[in-house]
């Protein structure tokens, strides 16, 4: 179970709704993955070229999954705050995935403006989930202004590279043990999702890895299973890696000459 802002969700997977081949494939993918939330932006066009409107909103409602609006495409504090306020009116929710991009090539979050916007929105009653880097200090500042969960990236959006800064992500997890951390962006394979879940991260948010795959419906299922498997492995307590071999079969009753040195 995933807990965010004192609210509990049955899944640790969050799924984006952009760039699916057709609305029907989007709907089937969501139903297959059964995510905790589905993200959507006021700025994006609907699936298959459908304009963002009542039809797309009806499709989202049919899935029965809570909607997490985002501020994708925003590059200033005022733009992000205004978009979040509009999203609250349209989708009737205080949840917001806060995105503030600082570089057009890498789509890296502008953590300075992110902190400022997060503080404004939290004071306005929003439950803010900020899309951020793995920078520990920036993440602490987001917590200082009232964020109760963070969404650090694994790699730049849409790259599918997996956790390119594994050390920094593991440090972040170690130093913020009680903060829900959801890996957002950069994952391309279910194995990569399982890996970060094995490290102890609380959830994963995906879009491109599913929507642009050869078979989004089956890929959605694959990621859902990977996230669940990774979490189970973390909770089970994996064995530590060793430099030397260690037999799993007991040596009791083994003939003495088997241990002789040659």
Swiss-Prot record:
Reactions that this protein is recorded to catalyse: [ThiS sulfur-carrier protein]-C-terminal-Gly-aminoethanethioate + 2-iminoacetate + 1-deoxy-D-xylulose 5-phosphate = [ThiS sulfur-carrier protein]-C-terminal Gly-Gly + 2-[(2R,5Z)-2-carboxy-4-methylthiazol-5(2H)-ylidene]ethyl phosphate + 2 H2O + H(+)
- Signal sequence coordinates: none
Q: What are the record keywords, sorted?
A: Cytoplasm, Schiff base, Thiamine biosynthesis, Transferase
Q: What's its EC?
A: 2.8.1.10
Pathway it acts in? Cofactor biosynthesis; thiamine diphosphate biosynthesis
Q: Which GO terms describe its cellular component?
A: cytoplasm
- Annotated spans, Disordered: 243-262
Q: Which GO terms describe its molecular function?
A: thiazole synthase activity
Quote the InterPro entries the UniProt record gives.
Aldolase_TIM, Thiazole_synthase_ThiG, ThiG
Its family?
Belongs to the ThiG family.
Oligomeric state and interaction partners are given as: Homotetramer. Forms heterodimers with either ThiH or ThiS.
Q: What does this protein do?
A: Catalyzes the rearrangement of 1-deoxy-D-xylulose 5-phosphate (DXP) to produce the thiazole phosphate moiety of thiamine. Sulfur is provided by the thiocarboxylate moiety of the carrier protein ThiS. In vitro, sulfur can be provided by H(2)S.
Q: What is this protein called?
A: Thiazole synthase
Q: Which organism is it from?
A: Neisseria meningitidis serogroup C (strain 053442)
């Amino acid at each position: 179970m995933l807990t965010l802002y004192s609210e509990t969700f049955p899944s640790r997977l969050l799924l984006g709704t952009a760039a699916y081949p057709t609305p029907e494939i989007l709907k089937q993918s969501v139903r297959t993955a059964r995510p905790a939330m589905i993200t959507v932006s006021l700025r994006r066009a609907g699936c298959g070229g459908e304009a963002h409107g009542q039809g797309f909103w009806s499709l989202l409602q049919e899935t029965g999954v809570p909607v997490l609006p985002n501020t994708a495409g925003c590059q200033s504090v005022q733009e992000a705050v205004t978009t979040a306020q509009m999203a609250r009116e349209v989708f009737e929710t205080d949840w917001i995935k806060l995105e503030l991009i600082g570089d057009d090539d890498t789509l890296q979050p502008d953590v300075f403006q992110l902190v400022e916007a997060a503080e404004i929105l939290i004071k306005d009653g929003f439950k803010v989930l900020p899309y951020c880097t793995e920078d520990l200090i920036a993440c602490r500042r987001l917590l200082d202004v009232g964020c109760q969960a963070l969404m650090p990236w694994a790699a730049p959006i849409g790259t599918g590279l997996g956790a390119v800064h594994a050390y920094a992500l593991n440090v972040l997890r170690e130093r913020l043990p009680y903060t829900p951390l959801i890996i957002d962006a950069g994952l391309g394979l279910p194995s990569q999702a399982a890996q970060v879940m094995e490290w102890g991260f609380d959830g994963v948010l995906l879009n491109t890895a599913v929507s642009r795959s050869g078979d989004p419906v089956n890929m959605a299922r694959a990621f859902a299973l990977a996230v669940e498997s990774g979490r189970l492995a973390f909770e089970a307590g994996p064995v530590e890696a060793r430099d030397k071999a260690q037999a799993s079969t007991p040596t009791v009753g083994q003939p003495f000459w088997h241990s002789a040195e040659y």
